[in-house]
């Protein structure tokens, strides 16, 4: 038997139900009633929006709540010149003060003392400097405030910035002056920037604050600081303090960044590090080179002088090298730890290897050998044309290992005089 509806002739629609509800609220089913109803709804939504923004302002500005980027210090000082280097004449006073006298020290649970950096500390104003007669205080603030300098002039922005670390504890004033003047002379010839920092400025950032053990990993810290100080620079050229730029007439653009020159200097199909199964690529796009770094005579990465682009790939490498886990890893390497870390990432990340040009030492860091530097026809560091040792006309002379030999001051001084004579 078919089921019949209980009520005949009655139909229900959403329109009739809506109309009954509309009438119960006191609105007539005409044009005026509809407008009145919509006006009330609009007013309610507006009031809700107004009070939600008043009591919950974070929801309105969530996309713009990030603090401005900064380096080690929050408060920065605009630099008037693209040549940023410290007051080297303060070396005698800094030696007298020692590193402990420059920072606040904190006693740790294990009884050790750590140097502490105050990133929020303000720089000493010109008025305060004029009123201060304490020479020690002025030198201390000059040391601490130097890291706050940033260059933001867009009309005179350098394409390349030469970066170097200097050490007031282990080097004498004369040697430091020669190193700094060498970088300034080279940069001025090619309209480059200069970014030189005291090594001791970065000690509070390190977990291991022993300078001798952590020196290599201060290099990526100063490079990252240079990238921030010169945000529009295309390339950062790091040159170790144990090296001199010998041929001041060679610019990176015409010398190393030229594809024809790079093709001659590029090491193709060779192990990334000694005895590695991972090799450099046979086919390399020169225009995509973001990192240019030499091998040493043993076939390992030489981080004493290299060029890195101030872009995504360059910053990715530097941020990787600044990771505390990597910095404190017990690298099993006979050379320096930084070179081992760079070699590691290049072997395991083919994308980054494809952006890295590993070149012969001669183009960036020719090794100086005093035994080859004899006066006469074969003098001036002649090395029978090999690609490892310094010859007259090379861009740079590296004195790598001079600290262990105790010959840094004499070798730097000797070669610096040759630059001045040329």
UniProtKB/Swiss-Prot annotation:
Against InterPro entries, the record matches this protein to: Glyco_trans_34, Nucleotide-diphossugar_trans
- So which stretches are on the Lumenal side? 53-422
- Cytoplasmic side, ranges: 1-31
Could you tell me the superkingdom of the organism this chain comes from?
Eukaryota
State the Gene Ontology terms under molecular function: alpha-1,6-mannosyltransferase activity
Its BP terms in the Gene Ontology are:
cell wall mannoprotein biosynthetic process; protein glycosylation; protein N-linked glycosylation
Bilayer topology reads:
Single-pass type II membrane protein
Q: Name one GO cellular component term.
A: mannan polymerase complex
Query: Which locations, inside or outside the cell, does it occupy?
Result: Golgi apparatus, cis-Golgi network membrane
- Ranges that cross the membrane: 32-52
Q: Which Pfam families match?
A: Glyco_transf_34
Keywords of the record, alphabetical order, are: Glycosyltransferase, Golgi apparatus, Membrane, Signal-anchor, Transferase, Transmembrane, Transmembrane helix
Keyword Transferase assigned to the entry: answer is yes
Q: What does the record give as EC number?
A: 2.4.1.-
Subunit structure, as described in the record: Component of the M-Pol II complex composed of ANP1, MNN9, MNN10, MNN11 and HOC1.
Instruction: State the similarity comment.
Output: Belongs to the glycosyltransferase 34 family.
* Biological role stated in the UniProt entry: Required for synthesis of full-length mannan chains. The M-Pol II complex possesses alpha-1,6-mannosyltransferase activity and is probably involved in the elongation of the mannan backbone of N-linked glycans on cell wall and periplasmic proteins.
Question: What PANTHER family would the database entry show?
Answer: ALPHA-1,6-MANNOSYLTRANSFERASE MNN11-RELATED
One further remark on this entry is: Present with 3480 molecules/cell in log phase SD medium.
Name-wise, this protein is Probable alpha-1,6-mannosyltransferase MNN11
Which organism does this record belong to?
Saccharomyces cerevisiae (strain ATCC 204508 / S288c)
């Amino acid at each position: 038997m078919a089921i019949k509806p209980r009520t005949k002739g009655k139909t229900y629609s959403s329109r009739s139900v809506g109309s009954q509800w509309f009438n119960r609220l006191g609105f007539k089913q005409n044009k005026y009633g509809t407008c009145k109803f919509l006006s009330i709804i609009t007013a309610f939504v507006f009031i809700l929006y107004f009070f939600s923004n008043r009591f919950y302002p974070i929801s309105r500005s969530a996309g713009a709540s990030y603090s401005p980027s900064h380096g080690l210090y929050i408060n920065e000082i605009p630099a008037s010149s693209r040549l940023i280097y410290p007051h080297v004449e303060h070396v005698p006073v800094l030696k007298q003060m020692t590193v402990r006298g420059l920072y606040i020290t904190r006693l740790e649970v294990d009884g050790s003392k750590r140097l502490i950096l105050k990133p929020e500390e303000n720089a000493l104003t010109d008025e305060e400097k004029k009123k201060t007669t304490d020479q020690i205080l002025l030198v201390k603030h000059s040391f601490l405030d130097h890291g706050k300098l940033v260059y933001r002039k867009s009309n005179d922005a350098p394409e390349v910035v030469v970066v170097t670390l200097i050490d007031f504890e282990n080097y004498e004033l004369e040697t430091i002056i020669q190193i700094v003047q060498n970088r300034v002379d080279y940069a001025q010839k090619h309209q480059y920037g200069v970014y030189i920092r005291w090594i001791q400025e970065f000690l509070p950032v390190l977990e291991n604050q022993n300078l001798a053990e952590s020196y290599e990993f201060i290099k990526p810290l100063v490079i990252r600081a240079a990238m921030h100080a010169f945000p529009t620079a295309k390339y950062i050229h790091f040159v170790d303090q144990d090296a001199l730029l010998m041929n001041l007439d060679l610019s990176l653009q015409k010398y190393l960044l030229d594809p024809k020159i790079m093709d001659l200097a590029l090491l193709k199909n060779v192990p990334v590090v000694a005895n590695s199964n991972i090799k450099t690529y046979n086919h390399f796009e020169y225009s995509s080179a973001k990192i240019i770094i030499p091998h040493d005579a043993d076939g390992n990465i030489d981080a004493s002088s290299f060029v890195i682009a101030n872009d995504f790939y360059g910053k990715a490498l530097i941020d990787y090298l600044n990771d505390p886990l990597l910095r404190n890893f017990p690298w099993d390497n006979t050379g320096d730890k930084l070179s081992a870390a760079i070699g590691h990432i290049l072997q395991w990340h083919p994308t980054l290897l494809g952006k890295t040009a590993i070149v012969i030492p001669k183009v960036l860091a020719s090794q100086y050998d005093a035994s080859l530097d004899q006066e006469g026809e074969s003098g001036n560091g002649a090395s029978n044309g090999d690609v490892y040792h310094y010859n007259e006309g090379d861009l740079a002379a590296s004195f790598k290992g001079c600290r262990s030999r105790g010959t840094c001051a004499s070798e730097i001084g000797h070669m610096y005089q040759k630059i001045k004579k040329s």
